[in-house]
Amino acid sequence: MIEPALALVSFGKLDPAITAGAVSESTNTLTFSWDGGRYVYDDRAMFLVYDIENGVAEFDTSATKRLFKKGTFTLTKNFSGREVHVYLAFVSEDRKNRSNSQYLGKNTVL
């Protein structure tokens, strides 16, 4: 069995965020926020949402620029009402460098 809190979905040398979180504020979306860690102006955030019970995941490998410190992930499948495991990572614009992923915990999607 997979232990979601121990799983790495990204591995690399870019700095992770110092603080990070995710909340579901509207139907079928998660809003990610983060702060801290060194970065280059065009580094991007990567979002991953995993519904372990149904074996379904969705991700965006270049969601928004890291410097914005916030981004909304609209899910393409109906995750409404489901409990999901949430991960955040960062990637350089040229995709050559990544951070280790950070497990942000479980969320119930509105």
Model feature map: region roles:
Residues 1-26:
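N-terminal "mature-chain" segments and other terminal, solvent-exposed stretches
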Residues 26-40:
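Conserved aromatic anchor
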Residues 32-34, 47, 88:
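An aromatic-rich alpha-helical recognition segment common to small helix-rich domains
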Residues 2-5, 94-110:
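Extracellular fibronectin type III
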Residues 37-54, 82-84:
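Solvent-exposed loop/turn segments flanking beta-strands in beta-repeat/beta-sandwich domains
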Residues 73-100:
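Beta-strand-rich modules
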Residues 53-62:
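Surface-exposed loop/edge segments in extracytoplasmic proteins
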Residues 64-71:
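Short, solvent-exposed loop/turn segments in extracellular or other extracytoplasmic domains
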